Amino acid sequence: MLSLIADAPPHDAGFTSGLAYFRWLHELLPAPFFHTQAFLAFFALVLAVYWTIPRRFQMTRIWVLVIASFHFYAAWSFELAFLVTGTTLLDYLFGRAMGATDRPRVRKLLACTSVCMNLGVLCYFKYRGFFLNELYEGMRALGMDPGFTKLNPLEVIVPFGISFYTFEAISYAVDVYKRKIEPEKSLPRFLLFILFFPHLVAGPIVRAGDFLVQTRRPKRWNWLRVQLGVQLFLVGAFKKMAIADRMALYCDPVFKDPEAFGTVTVWFAVLAYAIRIYCDFSGYSDMALGAAHLLGYKLTNNFNMPYLAANVSEFWRRWHISLSTWLRDYVFIPLGGSRGGAWFTRRNLLLTMLIGGLWHGAAWGYIAWGAAHGLLLVFHKVFHDFCESRERLKAALDTWAGIGLRILVTFFCVSLCWVLFQPELGKALTVFEKLFSIQKGQTLLLSNWALWTTVGVLLACQLILRSGLWAQLHARLPAPVLGTGYAVCLCAALVLAPDAGTTFIYFQF
Amino acid sequence: MFRALFRLRPFVRTSPEGAPRARRSKRGRAALALVCGAGAFALLQVLFVVFTELSPVLSDPIYAARERQLGALRTEKPNDKLVLFLGSSRVQDAFRAGAVNGATAFNFGTPGAGPIANSLYLRRLHRAGHVPDVLFLELMYPLCADGGPWPQEGPLITADRVTRTERDLLIERYGFPGDLYRRLWRRSALVPFLTHGFKLIGRAAPDALPSNKQMRAAHGADDHGWLAPLEGLKPDPEKRDKQLAHYKPWVTDWRPGPWTHAALTDTFDLCRERGTAVALVLMPEGTAFRALPNPDARARIDSYVAELKAQFGCSVIDAREWFGDEQFLDGHHLLRPGAERFTARLVAEGIEPLLKARGAK
């Protein structure tokens, strides 16, 4: 199923009847993926135009980015680009209206309207099919006539990145309502906050407080920043093309048809999937950060070596940081956070993670994934409290061996949870059945040493980064050596990319 | 004024380390790194493209592997007559060239090679100094079928496998779609690392590729180019049906295509110029394959072969009916015992007479 998602054709239907301009645009930029030649050409053009405009015309630069971002989305679907722009305009107006009044009830009403509108759009596009189909199945099971036909999930068009920009808009409305930030007065700046193409389709989820302030700073061409941007973009491209797409060769066939494969192969596929999803999503995030840096903007860092986390709680402080902090600030804390008793906190953790699971996709698999992580967090909290009163156990867990063991156990749990991270729960359960009962079956056409090599290289890179060795080395390397390293990194990404690349997993969310 | 200068000093030196200067030097270093990176990338790309233009090692690894093997054989026995068998995977699997005595025989069968690929290969071999004394040329008639505006071999000879000169030849002489093929060629030249990446991995670390993409044809052949069919394989009806479905549209109402005829003509002309004797070979086929062309098409195939024989004065070895179905894996690729029998019969009926006629011992 994963590859079904990954290989799903871009939404082309609208282009057969759409305006000629948008059809032409779609031909130029058929899919909003950063590692394609079409995107690189588009980005080069935007960069050239953006930096050619003199610094004093800051607002013109912002408009250029807004227009480019709109075209970036419209090239995939112009109807949905208008939808996103329309809801953004309404969010802007709600924000301005909240800023214009001091009456608490009116402000609350406006904030609720903005939140409901965004959630409504999200539910209509993302969850309508799921809920209607579940309702249909439920009514049929009870012997009732649903009165409507079942929707084909493949025919339901979910706008790219809808979960990301609706969450950004919701956080803006809430922050304005709570007076954490001032409502944005400038329309182009607000449009850029939501539509900025590096983060539009797959995050990171930016906060208005972090981003809008950057739109006011005059941007200067800074070689250090450009270098950082290029470096991030290259690392992201390498992660995506050379690692994630290669790992897909190990896991996609198995997750597509788990029945056919033997237990050992399925275990390898689970390991490969854990690597794939990390490199795919963090690779995308790195590219987004790199692209933003090249335009003079700084986005939130979304990953911090999550597989080196020593417990699940730490994992969530390192994985998809922009989402986990969003869930903490706008779901967990409003639910009461850990201010109540132990059971109250556990309930809140479970609820937050369930919402996190549902955010990823309208399917039981994602909900189960969220629930599993919620349970892991609860278990971790219980274990943590248990260890607090046992000094020797605590000390043992804080030794090198203890930390290593905790990292391994955390990685094991998180990897098993990834099995649930797919729309079809039935397939996930088949994978679990295969994992925990020795069964014979097909093996993959690939040799496992490439998988182990990838694991080794990835681990070594993370350890080098964590130890700070890379930071020291980077500062001392002569510029030509560093530059040649960039070239080699890019060439290696191109060489190692499998001939049939896949889309980004997180684009579906 | 003196005082003013003194006042300025701390302003210029904001920190003991001289931070503004350090920042400038960091920026300069960043710019230099980026320029060097872009330059190195461009240079690597250009070198790669130049390398693929000069050598087929990365662009066409199967051909390059065969040519290397042939070169090694020729170095061992430089005075031997050279018997070359150009053809498709049917030839590659079927002809154990090492069994030929009294001459250096080499199986130059490569997957998907029809008359156009064979013509290109013969040109390359001539350039590399390998001029055969006797050439056995497979007439892979499904690939000679008139398939509309483009030759059937079009999708098989991908743009990344050929040099610029060969690209122009394919477009001008063999009916390859000019705009599309040029665009594809330019694309492969623009991002050679992406285009040739899996070939590079296939050469450096074949295990990193799925086993069906490891190009066994390039690495698994014996010294004489024979890719021996695996031991113990049996006829596979499922594979046969798949192959039949693949070839059916080309063969059922077969007519000779103009482009492949041009390629065949060129091959014969090249051979005549270099004094090479040519024998056309129709490779063995199972009954289901033989039944694919309708009676009219079959008659057209036979008459086309007769025309070629008359026009170019070559000998023809029609091996289509040499074996029963039990000798084929999928209806047209011989199994190991079939390959041994084919080789023995070809040597006796085709190679030895031709070699004798050429004065070999």
Residue map of PLM features:
Chain B
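N-terminal Lys/Arg-rich, disordered targeting/topogenic segments
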Residues: M1-A30
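Hydrophobic membrane-insertion alpha-helices, especially the h-region
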Residues: R29-E53
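Alpha-helical transmembrane signal-anchor/signal-peptide segments
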Residues: F51-T75
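Short extracytoplasmic
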Residues: E67-G98
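Membrane-embedded segments
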Residues: L86, R90-D179
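Secreted/periplasmic serine-hydrolase-like ester/acetyl group-modifying domain
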Residues: Q152-R274
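Active-site segments of SGNH/GDSL-like serine hydrolases
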Residues: H196, T267-P293
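Long, positively charged, glycine-interspersed low-complexity recognition regions
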Residues: R290-K361
